Amino acid sequence: MFFQPIVDLSSGKMTHCECLIRMLDNDGNFIPPASFLDIANESGLMPRLDYLVIEKAMRQQVVWQRAGVNTRLSINITAPTLDQPDFAQRIAEIVNRTGADPRALIFELVETDALQDIDNARRLLKQLQTLGASIALDDFGIGFTSFEYVRELPVDYIKIDKAFVQFVHERENDRVLVRSIVEMSHGLGKRVIAEGVDSRQALEVLRALDVDYIQGYYISRPVPINALNLRTTLPD
C-alpha cells in the first residue's frame, strides 16, 4: 500500500493522505492500477480487496495515533462494497478490532460502477459519519459521479477529477468548471480537494479559485510508508 499526501492550501501543510494500492510484476515494475482493479471488479473481488485495504489502513492509523501523529487517512471504497447491506457494520467491527479512531478516517466513494441502491448507500454513509468518519466523493465530474450523488449522499468532501485540474492554468473551460464546482460545493457546506495537481501554475490557479486542498505529483507521488514525509508542505 502506498500513500499520497493531501495538503491544505490555507496552511500549506499536509492534513491527510490517501491510501493507494500498488502492485509489482515479476520484474519489479509497477502494474497500472486500472489493470488489476478492473480484473478485481469484473471477478467480484472488489469488496474483499476493499476490506483488506481498509483494515491495513486502520492499523497504520493506530500506529500514527500512538506516535502522536494527527494525519488523517483517506480510504477508497467502491460501489460494489458500499452496496453491501452490512458494510457499515463491518467497518465498525474493523474499528473495534484495530482500535482505530474513526475521526481520523475519510472514506472516498470511488465510481468504478454505479451504485445499485442510492438509498442504502445514504443510510450506510450516515452510519459511518455517526462513527465519526468523514465521506468524500471521488473523481467528481466524470464517470458515474453526478450531481445526484452530491444532492443525495451525505458527503463532506468533493474531489475534483484530475481531468479538470492538470491543465487548469492553460484551459479557460477547466477554470470555469472548477470555479463552478467550488462555488457549488462551498454553498452546500462541503470542502473541495483538487487531485492531479502537477505544477506550480495549476496550484496558484486553484488557490485563486478558493480550492481547499490539493493532491498531486507537484506535492508528492504516492510513496511507501517508509518514504512518506509526515511533515510534507507546499514546495517553496
Segments from the language model and where they lie:
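EAL-family c-di-GMP phosphodiesterase catalytic domain
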Residues: 9-13, 26-27, 61, 78-85, ...
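Bacterial c-di-GMP phosphodiesterase EAL domain
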Residues: 1-100, 112, 126-127, 147, ...
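Glycine-rich, phosphate-binding/catalytic loops in enzymes
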Residues: 37, 90-94, 123-126, 152-154, ...
